[in-house]
Swiss-Prot record:
Name under which the protein is recorded: Imidazoleglycerol-phosphate dehydratase
Compartment(s) of residence: Cytoplasm
Gene Ontology molecular function: imidazoleglycerol-phosphate dehydratase activity
Designated gene of the protein: hisB
Known EC number: 4.2.1.19
GO cellular component: cytoplasm
NCBIfam families per UniProt: PRK00951.2-1 (NF002111), PRK00951.2-4 (NF002114)
Enzyme class: lyase
Length: 195
């Protein structure tokens, strides 16, 4: 199998991002987004996915973190899509349920090329680590649509916003590990392609 990795550099008036991803890594990360909580969450996701992720971002944080987090998700989704290549042999579907202290979160993904997000964040507090909870909905939406994946995140219960999001990122990492595992011959689709 060819190496499943990709890299992108993207500069706009709002952000300057460079991102390298190796799907078949060891969970090693070098992340500096300027948003400490995001660094923590992306490190957790990468560890549980087994991704090697090198990410640098300089964003317009003097405004807020919205552009930074949304653009990181767009670039991560694009790099993930490129690194997956033709998707031959992958399981395609992955899922995980993760407890984090009082919180329980389930994530289910389908790397079918059909982008969709199901994300009910009513349980999340309005502010998490200094950011409005809506910024995380935009993060996951941008990731799902740019990666071409169906992403369901279910916050089953919990009180602490940090714990709920940490559970989501860990579960997403485990779901990626499962979905990207190569265990089949050909493409995981009765129609013969994933696009």
């Amino acid at each position: 199998m060819s190496q499943r990795s990709a890299a992108i550099a993207r500069t706009t008036k709002e952000t300057d991002i460079s991102l390298k991803l190796n799907i078949d890594g060891e969970g090693n990360t070098n992340i500096d987004t300027g948003v400490g909580f995001a660094d923590h969450m992306l490190t957790l996701m990468s560890f549980w996915a087994g991704f090697d992720l090198d990410l640098k971002c300089k964003g317009d944080l003097e405004i807020d973190s919205h552009h930074t987090l949304e653009d990181i998700a767009l670039v991560l989704g694009q790099v993930l899509s490129e690194a997956m290549g033709d998707k031959k042999g992958i399981n395609r579907i992955g899922f995980a349920k993760v407890p984090m202290d009082e919180a329980l979160v389930e994530v289910v993904i389908d790397l079918s090329g059909r982008a969709y997000l199901v994300y009910d964040d009513d349980i999340l507090p309005p502010i998490i680590a200094g950011d409005e909870r809506d910024v995380w909905r935009e993060f996951f939406k941008s990731l799902a649509f740019k990666a071409g994946m169906n992403l369901h995140i279910k916050f089953e219960y919990g009180r602490n916003g940090h714990h709920l999001l940490e559970g989501a990122f860990k579960a997403l990492g485990l779901a990626f590990r499962n979905a990207l595992s190569v265990e089949r011959q050909g493409v995981s689709s009765t129609k013969g392609s994933l696009d």
